[in-house]
Amino acid sequence: MKSHKDMTMKRHFCIWSTALLLSLTATAQTGAVYDSDTTAIAARRYAAATPWDITDTDKDVFDTFEGLVRTMGLEEGKTADLSDEAEIAMPEPRLAYVNLTGITDIPTSKQRQLQAWMEMYDGEGRYFRKRLLVKAQGGYSIRFPKRNFSVIFCNENWEEEDTPDFSIGDWVRQDGFHFKAFYTDFMRGTGEIGYKWYRQMVADRLPFWERGGYYNESRALCVPDGFPCIVYLNGKFLGVYAWQLKKHRRNMNMKKATAEHVHLDGNVNDLYLFNGKVNWKQFEARNPKQLYTSKGEPYDGNYPSELIDEKCKGFYNAEDSAEVREGKERSAKVKQYILRLSGYKKELAAFEREGEETLKRELEKRFDIQSLLDYQVFFRVLMNGDGTLKNWQWFTYDGVKWMVAPYDLDQTFGITLYGFPRPATHTLSTITSGPFTFISRYYAREEAERYAELRQKGVLSEEAILPVIHDWYGRVGTEWYEMEKRRWPESPCYCEAVCNDGWKVCDDWSIYNSTPNYDEYRTYRAGDICVLDGRLWEATKRVTGVFPYVRNSDIDTLERMVAWISERLNVLDEYYGYEPGQMAVQRPAPDTVSGKEEGIYTIDGKRIPQRRKGINIVRYGNGASRVIYQK
């Protein structure tokens, strides 16, 4: 049997080596835990009364929030209790710790909000306990046993009015957040890694809103961002989550009463919008706010429907208040902007008949080409197979020119909906929804140039992405990953595929696009191959009506993901005809731009007062930018 001293040293070494608890060897920090009556007990008193003592029976001390708090060696006066603060500003935690109480489980519905309490400790001396409303979050993922959830902090009456505002790191102020489970993803944060990489990709571009003619200083990202978080439910370990920014107007730098600031989310594609017919139930107008439906009722994004305009009964109602009248007029404007967007593809098809030059000129009046090219390159690099129909955001700042940005990146880096990875050599079909039809036809050169530019700058490189991957993995740490695996052993990324008798997995991905789908009425003979649920299956004997698999999954690892990046870039170098070492596409030199330097930025888009060692992005008054390497 191991000695108490050996076990203690082993535990501490594991914690330190994985950056699990950052401050154990520095000054002690305090927090708070609660008894069954939710009465605050100062953690310093609890720790003093029950000193940490690892034994064989309590080695899983981190399984409970109480054990976590006790383990962190808390002392009086070392923690800032922010529970009573209306506004909280804090650096982004490397790893946060959250305990939800007042509910028995994570909700299963996005429509029903539950009242709960949240305790948060940032691992660096800050703590709070606040009321919040919690509901399920996500689409397909809502059926997984480990679910995403959304929280909105509320006042003492459980209302969303006068709610506390949080400023975390460089994020915009928010009063609510998403907590992403990433159940099929072994990193429990692959999507967050993708967003961070995308921000590096577009760091040399002007902000989206300025490209749309709206000039208002903001820290908005126009895509989510997140940091790792350990979540407990009623004191018991629930899992590793990502604490993430919501799709909120502040993160889009939009005003809720400005009709031209339109943000669409959902099934925005040829089937429901771009081909001239609008299915209003398939997507949500997230901004502006205070909209009204064609029936004169307040617009509800959970149940989207057609917006009101002058042709609708009830648009003119003498009993409407000034606020309602304003909302209806705003709705009519937004509706016209969306209808106009719906007709763009037909208009552009007509211009296409007049020639490429005319088509490009008209396309660039209607869409931000930079965002389309960046999205296309990003789509191909990360193999974002779920980002061509609904998991993207479409938005405009003037009601005329639209742009696109990614959202929901859980199926990237080869990871599929079912959790098994696809090889980096696997190809994706071309995006054809909306304006991408014309991007694929007429902007192949510009797309290849953008890819080459990003490769030359080092943004699309192993050196740029691997530190982001390793940073996330290190912030969570191997011990928490082991706990996650014990808590959710059926997670697809932890399990090998299980085939029914007569079938086996086929790994020849080169034939995927030419292989027919599984047909339950067909008789398959040994060697016959079919596609089902994103994977190839090969019959090992004569079978009819036998489903190929019991469990469609595969074990995934950090090593697989790291190797995938290198191989994927090699594949795309060949696809785009890029040769490492070729000259990058040049931005205008300082003497060819008009105006003074607008600002200096880091590679991930943060403004800095002066150039730093390494890569700097210098922007000029006319919108041009240069990448400068400072020795």
Regions found by a protein language model. Name each.
Residues V151, K365-T416:
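Active-site acidic catalytic loop and adjacent metal/ATP-binding pocket
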Residues T396-V505, D554, L558-P580:
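C-terminal catalytic region of ATP-dependent kinase domains
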Residues G577-D604:
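Residue-level detector of functionally pivotal "anchor" positions at catalytic/ligand-binding pockets or at interdomain
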Residues T27-Q137, G477-D507, S553-Q582:
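Regulatory N- and C-terminal appendages and interdomain linkers associated
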Residues A497-W564, N570:
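Tryptophan-rich substrate-binding surfaces of secreted polymer-degrading and adhesive proteins
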Residues D165, K180, W243-V381, L454:
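ATP-dependent phospho-/nucleotidyl transfer catalytic cores
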